[in-house]
Amino acid sequence: MRLKVLTLTLAVTVSACSEDPVQPTGVPSPTASAAAQSAGANRSIVEFNGQLRKDFRSQVAALGGRVDFVAEGVGFAGVSGLSATAVATLRRSPGIAAVYDDITVQVDAVRRGSAVAADVSAMSPANPAAALLFPSLQWNMVAVNAPAAWAAGNLGSPNVTAAILDSGIDYDNFDMNGLVDLARSTSFVPSDDAILAALFPTRNPIDDLGGHGTLVATQASSNALVFAGVSSRTRLMGIKVLGFTGSGSLGGILAGLVWAADHGADVANMSLGVTGGVDKAHEGLFVGIVNRVFNYAQSKGMVVVVAAGNDAIDMDGDGRNFSAFCEAPHVICVSATGPTSGMPFQGPWGNVDAPADYSDIGRQNITVAAPGGSNFGFVSALCARHFIQVVNNAPTFPCISGTFILGGAGTSASAPHVTGLVAQLIAKYGKGRPSQIKHLLINGVDDLGAPGKDPFYGYGRINVLKALSQ
């Protein structure tokens, strides 16, 4: 997702928003950590035959590696630091079914923009339509008929949890404060953990250094002080699987999905994809483990919403690659719509339901469409305060004051609109019924494009009020 940062002058303050970064000696720099994170050949996924051996961690340590995570419910682990010889030794060990190199997942980088001014002191999450910048910037919420749903009392429930698998969440900014369940949140990105411990040692490991996750989370659920989300009461679980550079490992992402299912998430949002796809002929192991993990999530009663991808690929004609996560079982795969005219942060926006030119499509895989934005109209949120930009090999923090907003376009932004609606459907119709919730979602869309299911919109563009009025 392409993002732009804008200055936002706020008339009220938030605790902990003015923490200044420090760079102690003897700790990894952001650039060094990013290089380590991108070294995909040094990360491996280990599949077990049956249950995890009790001595697995010590065995990996003896071989010179480290266990980064274990997903016992599905029978795999992620390790790093093993040499080729050590990997070969581990493959021959009792109880090990397979060991193979992990692969990298990537989202688009961020870009900077210009300034606006605002006052959030009179806003309230009880009325999302009164959010400070809803009238002037959030064409996306209007496009999915969210204001009418809010007016009818559909605000979501704190008893429903949406897991955001992403770069983290700025968990105590205006729009997130109190919504994020830190006790059930976690990080699968050791490189980011090291940066946070060095620069912002009092922050939770899910603090967002990349900006992407906070924008995504806001579309699903928000306090609606500055920007409204589809829901204003849904709880959020932050699961960091992407570092500040926007990259992470497939193994870490799958482990994050297992974590979400094991810790009571009702719906999970995955606004990310495998760089270049996965070649089915040569990477069949990955397809197998992806299927196992998504089947596990379904068995735990969790709905999984995934972004279609931003490569303008027709997935119907690309039978060689496992595209993003849209081919995984049980998922809701979301394409993007966006305006065809207007100024990105000013409007007026024309034809907001047009298929976005970057969105991956495919009659077989696309379930529904939702606003993702375009060069003419962005999807926006508060910028994560500890968002890192590296300038001349040194970290800078353009959003540190808490007075910035972020705008972007991509299927990363469209997916969380659906996640917020799914959370509301679960609040209304009950938990643990992912197939029923998917049916209700599909039954409540506006059928755009060719009648029935088509490659661009799937079954149609979501309509929040219509889906919640069944």
Regions found by a protein language model. Give the residues of each.
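Sec-dependent signal peptide recognition
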Residues: 2-8
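Subtilisin-like serine protease catalytic core
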Residues: 137, 148-186, 190-251, 263-267, ...
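Extracellular S/T/G-rich loop segment that most often corresponds to the catalytic His/Ser-adjacent loop
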Residues: 166, 323-427, 431, 465-469
